[in-house]
Amino acid sequence: VPKCPKSGHRNTRDECSVVSEASGGAPRLERVRCGPEGADLVVRQRQVWLRSLSGLEPIDVIFRRLEDDRVDPMEVNAQGSAGVPGLLLAARSRGVGLANAHGSGVLEDPALGEHWDAAGAWLTGRASDYQQVWPLPFMPAADRSEREWTTWPSYDGTGLVDRAITLRLHLVASDKGIDVLQGGSARVLLPGDDPIRPTAATAKDVWVVGGTVAPPSLRRRDPLPQVDLIESVPTRAAEALFWGGRAMERAEILARSMEVVLDRTSGLVAAEVAEPWVEHGLDMLAAVAGVPLRSGDPGRAGATFASGVEALAKQLGSFLAEASSVREFFSTTAGRMLARLAASRAQLRWMVTEDGSPGPSVVDIARIDGRALETILVDLASLSGLWNESLVRGPAWRFGEIGRRLERAFGVIDGVSGAFGLYRGEPLSAMSWTAGDADDHRIDFQRQRVIELILATNESLVAYRRRHRSDVEFQTAVHLVVAEVHNPRAAASAIREVRHQAGRLGWERGVEETTGLLSIIEAASFESVESTAVVLTQVFAGCDRFARDVVGSYLAAPVDPRMMGRD
């Protein structure tokens, strides 16, 4: 942001008063911390509003840098999600002022550049004033001496080279004249770059100085007033952290499920040699990944793992996409973790063929996945620590935390339901593991292996061994991963954290909903798989309803907003 003297700021406000009729001559000048982007603004009743966590805030003037063809997808040939639908209608209806006005991009058209000097002289009638302005050198016709002042030294990684730049200065016009701001912006162009759309992300510092160098002087500056912009965080930021937190948590649950199954089977999970508990491990993995169970399929193991790898890559991609849109929330260290996860995602996408089928063999997939999964889990654990220790606990972060904890509860329920046969409609306690086999000890062994899978997937096996020091049992194991509020990996602990964050946001209905879910879990006995299935179904439905309420109550713009204090 260029430095703006007091006179420049005052003139900017004065000009905004002229541009904006909707503000009644008193527009607010507000710098939004993150953004705003097109998704942060919405047009209702022919007026523009900022979607913030405190509700919709009216926008009187928009200072835009977007190209003319990317302003309003409803009226110009915009592609993708660029622009704000209905913005030009609001501008024509005088519901918002645009600076710069739509169509002013023609001033930057290179084809018209050679005519602007003559146009300026004709408009002002003072042609002599332009004699002191350098004539524009039109490349490539200009000779080297004319091009030297358009190139600046730049470091390309090996040494200093000449690079062309695009320079942009900022001026504010008023009745008293024109104020030139003390700073500008410059972008370095790579060879072959279009000056209008440079690809390089390298910038240069720009200072605007007068014709003579003034002696250095120290001036005392009055401290700027402290303005808390936390309530003006665009809803997009909260939405990105909410969905990003969910994707990050689901990726961790999925990666750990795959690692646990691979570790306990040593990669030998072919259907013809697998023991019955392995089938339930694959059911658990399919449930967590959200892919078909493929029961009875001879190639089920390879297909399930290939689908799991693909699902993990998609979850990481979703998280990275959301995180990139709110990059200003994350520290530099977190940025390194995001880059490592992006590299891991690229590696995962090479593990399956284009049609989603597995690679050469199940063993090969297991070996490759084992290395990649360990790296992903370490990076996700590091990022989770940074999430809790480095991000400021503002409203946007709280929505991200709600998303993470909700997804953790969903993951626990999916894993338990899948492992114990609830998704295939054959609960573990009702199954005959081997036809005609009455060996109860053998059946107990199979059940214990399934229970160990659930505990290990939720990082609770060590806690179980330390607390009970006995063989794993269904009731105590399920209570530990579902109902134990002191176990941070348990569903109840996650829901309790959701309730806490809802309370900090002042959302009483959310507190009531989560309190009801905790009461259901607390009253459950988990004596059998069937009774557990009833509880898990109720809790899952309640969490899903809560997630939908979050989106509907906070992350969706109302159709008919009204400003407080205005007729």
Language-model-detected regions and their locations in the chain:
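Alpha-helical transmembrane segments and their helix-helix packing motifs
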Residues: 1, 11-26, 114, 151-567
